[in-house]
Amino acid sequence: MSAFPISDIGGSWEYSHAPPTATSATGIPGFPEQSVGGLQLPFPGYTYVGASPLTQPRRHFPNSTPVLGNYAGLSSDREVIATSLNPYISKFSANAEWPISDIHQSKKSVYIPEERDVSNQFQTDKQQQQQFMKLPDPQMQVQLCDKELWDQFSRAGTEMIVTKTGRRMFPGYRIKISGLDPTAKYCVMLDIVNVDDHRYKFQHGEWTVAGRGEPHLPQRFFLHPNSPANGSKWMSEIISFHKVKLTNSIGRDVDGKIVLNSMHRYQPRVHIVRTDDISSVHMQRLCTFAFPQTVFITVTAYQNSEVTKLKIDNNPFAKGFREDGARAKKPRNQHNHFSDNDTSPYSEQRRSYYEPGSYTHLPYYNNSPMNVPSHHHYDNQTMNREFLPEAKRNRIMPESNSIHAPSLSVFHPGNENAVSQWQDVPDLNEMYNANDNNYNSVANQSIHNVQYTQNGITSHSPVQPVPHDNSFTYYNSSSPSSSDSNQSNVNASFSVMTTTHASHSINDIMRISEHADVTSPNINIPNTVETNVHSSDSGIGSSPPTPSDDDASNLIPGTEEIFKDDGKVLDGENLPDMSDLISLTERKESGEANANSHTEDFSRNPACQSGDTIESKDIQTLQVASVTDTYSYQKNYVENSSHQSYNNSQEFSYHSNAMPESNCESSVDPNLDWESNLLTM
């Protein structure tokens, strides 16, 4: 164990070289002939421990004066202290060894070293000494590139980001080398050492010492990927260490990364080794260069705003943070926060469907199988169709707030099994614009008739017989023709259409009949048929009319037995079949008809109940609904010459427990009793 004189520790550190010794073989100041165990020590000033590099002094080197290498081996455990060119290592004589001696017996804890000449302990081998003491390249010079940029950062206080995954340095460490042997092989390395043992903090716009720093990790060298290479190659290009990454995490993936502690000051250094074998770099002579303006402080986030501005203005990868960069604020319009020329998927063309203020809730689509009623009831009737895009207008079907949503399936050839409006839905634009943009308009298409009301209720009526399955019953309807204008007979056909879809609620049917704009042709029924039906004020859903015994003469011939059973009038609950009720619609009151009138909801229109004349010229739709099941009875009248006025209600709602489930047209013979008619259905 060796010790330094206590009286000399407080002396000043000088940057002058030690005087040449008498035993110097090369004439270089501070390089005496030394050997330990027969091995010459070419670079005095370092304590050599095997082949591992020494920890450099924790003081900032004032200039870029090269520091001679520190790689050599020892065959002995003897510690040698020598004079060095580096004043930060030692300023004491290399020929003095300070042994431990006991001079003061009373103070055994105090030891005064005794100087002793140990020069005779070194064996001299001039050939080996010349080999190790020769400088690799005395004319070698290193120039720092981007010196002006480094000076700007140095004046502001350079900060480097360290992350767990590693962050590259900016400004990048780039150098230019000269004075090498063009034919010799060289390896270039980079390491980063700590400047002092302090931890820093940024306070009040400047960096101050915050306490003692954390223990520093062993140094790691970053070997340039082009190593080894000829001297001519190194001198012909700029050497860049832009791939070096700074990290604060010790992990397995440390290739190309240098581990540093945050909030500490560090100094990058460049080492040049003359060798052609990478595996023996640590055993070869090297030259080290350092530049004072490259000192930086490691941070996890930039502390100084001036440094941040310099990084943004000079780093090509930080263009997005500039005022005119991609992350700069752009003017936004009031609709979609995008410019008119923006091709973003959230542009106005695609976002108009979600324009705020058009409706209160998002649209609800009833696309459940078999139209199973959903528990989500959104107020879609307040929806403004003007905000809907073209694609959505052709697909969305408004729905009511009733428990059972109306069926939205379209019945036409090729779509018999449709259970959802997404399979085939008519163009609502055509229906909306069918009659001067009136909601109460009818779009008579080639395949089916669609009635679109203002309340958002739609109904579909096929006009041609199409193939059907067990789920649907189609009916045949006749349209008026000019060729049959002279015919005087009345063709009336009844059919029953049953479906497995969700049934219409009573309120839906009432809205359909209330806002329907479907007209029927003028019908002429013989005046011998008289009608005396007592309508209830309740309209749809009320009890059926019960004619008295005196009214039997006014019934349609052949229907007296329907209302007579052992001299008792049948009430609505005992009616055996809905087909019997159809005959009630045959009771008409003759009168003169006026042209261009509309069919109204007779059960709810006071004018109709009071006996006013109502005319019709197109198709009259009669629907009979029950509470449990809904059956649409539609009656088509074709009239060619005369007119017929109607009185009283044309829609009935009865309770029936015996509803015929038939998929074909039913023909009711008025000359038969109700039991025979039931069998024929």
From Swiss-Prot:
Tissue: Differentiating muscle and tailbud tip.
SMART domains in alphabetical order: TBOX (SM00425)
InterPro entries, per database record: p53-like_TF_DNA-bd_sf, T-box_DNA-bd, T-box_sf, TF_T-box, TF_T-box_CS
GO molecular function: DNA-binding transcription factor activity, RNA polymerase II-specific; RNA polymerase II cis-regulatory region sequence-specific DNA binding
Disordered: region residues: 316-351, 456-489, 521-558, 589-611
Low complexity biased stretches: 470-489
Biased composition (Polar residues): 521-534
DNA-binding region: 149-323
Domain of life: Eukaryota
GO cellular component: chromatin; nucleus
Gene3D superfamilies referenced in this protein's UniProt entry, alphabetically: Transcription factor, T-box
Subunit structure: Monomer.
Protein name: T-box-containing protein 2
UniProt organism field: Halocynthia roretzi (Sea squirt)
